[in-house]
Amino acid sequence: MSASSMVKRAINGSLLACLLIAAPGHAQKTEPVWGYKVRPGDRLIDIAKSYQKNPDDWKKLQQSNTVPDPKLLQPGKQINIPVADLKQGDPFAAAVLVHGDVQRLDKSGQPVAKVVSGDVLKMGDTIQTGARSTLTVRFADDSRMLVTEKSKITLSSLVNYGKTGMADTKVQVHQGGTDSQVSPQKGPVARYEISTPALNLAVRGTGFRIQVDEGNGATRTEVVEGLVAGESQGSQAMIAAGFGILAEPGKALGQPTRLLNAPVLGETSNLVKKLPARFEWTALAGALRYRVQMLAVVQGNDAIIVDEVSDNNKAQWDELPDGDYRLRVRGIDASGLEGANATKAFTVKTRPEPPELSLPKNEHRSVDEKVVFRWSVAPQAQDYRFQLAEDAEFKNLVAAVPRIAGSNRAVLFAVPAGQYYWRVASITSTGDVGPFSDAFTFTRSAAATQ
């Protein structure tokens, strides 16, 4: 199916209708209600206490839902409660993870307070992320938004309808980028909407990215999964997964275009034991450049620690702390739209650093049966781990000493004639074992006969 036919078909869908209903001039004619399905043992008064602002309104529920006996409810029956009567929780969101410099701004746009992980964000807050800084926000319905570097957003609406699970979330993105993972929006007033200087977006459960230019407010939207309804200057479009759209202030929306496929990452180990960490990917047809992101995984949440645009199909990092990471790479087309992610999870474990091997030197040859192995002092090392093998993969171990006191830094072994490989790892005072050093090889030749 072509992008054009997909758009025409989707415009008739319910999501775009929801967007239009929410827009000015399209007010709902009937009062919205939320439906509660009766469970065994439920009483009408208990339902009212749990979900209504005024528990005494259970009598009104009895009348509007035609309930003969408020203490004897039929399991499975739906009790309709006017949305206007529903309890509302506190209007807030949570700063789940902050990386770098993230600030609350006052009405004049000046920073007034730093945002840290665990902070409560309130309706009306304007938040700004600095360079190489990100913020992950969790909303009342468990939807999440990753705010990328050099961005500014305002939390316009954070209505929380308590135990119903419904939330009415509206965010203004003034500049920069966001990456949203939206929980399925169930219920008549459950909404997740984003507005920018060029575009209004509404979703009912999806994953999508937006990027707003700081200069003119032009907005690029890329849908990763689900559907997103867009509206600008009276024109509407539905953007399906795998499609994106460019919106410019004062201009009607064009048709969504297909995003680039994900590039193919080269084969690399999931464990990086020695820096630099190097990655390559196949050149992608239609990609002028590539977005390269390194995400640190902290308590199950992603923090973007590197966000670069590259002209090359390779990247490397000379310094990365030990930890779990995800690499994301996607192509950027001629209109600036970014395609599907190629993703790789990996772990960096380079510390404590191994010592430098001293004797026997690499590729040394000797006729001595007894061989002394020596190495240098390594930072953070209290003790050392030693291995001697007949093969470079260390599958056939000749000797393995799990812990050697750091004051020694030497071991002695008698070995028969043959080629050998040896290596050493550092152990900290807490028992943390680092990666092994690069192996040295040596050959012990048979002694010449007299």
Segments the model singles out, each with a brief description of its role:
Residues 74-78, 82-275, 387:
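Flexible, surface-exposed loop/linker segments and immediately adjacent secondary-structure boundaries
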Residues 30, 50-90:
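Extracellular LysM carbohydrate-binding repeats and other cell-envelope/extracellular binding modules
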Residues 305-311, 400-406:
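Short beta-strand segments within Ig-like beta-sandwich modules, predominantly Fibronectin type-III
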Residues 317-324, 412-419:
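Surface-exposed, short loops/turns at beta-strand junctions within beta-sandwich domains
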Residues 27-52:
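Primarily a LysM-type cell-wall glycan-binding module
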Residues 335-348, 429-444:
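Extracellular fibronectin type III
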Residues 277-286, 371-381:
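Conserved aromatic anchor
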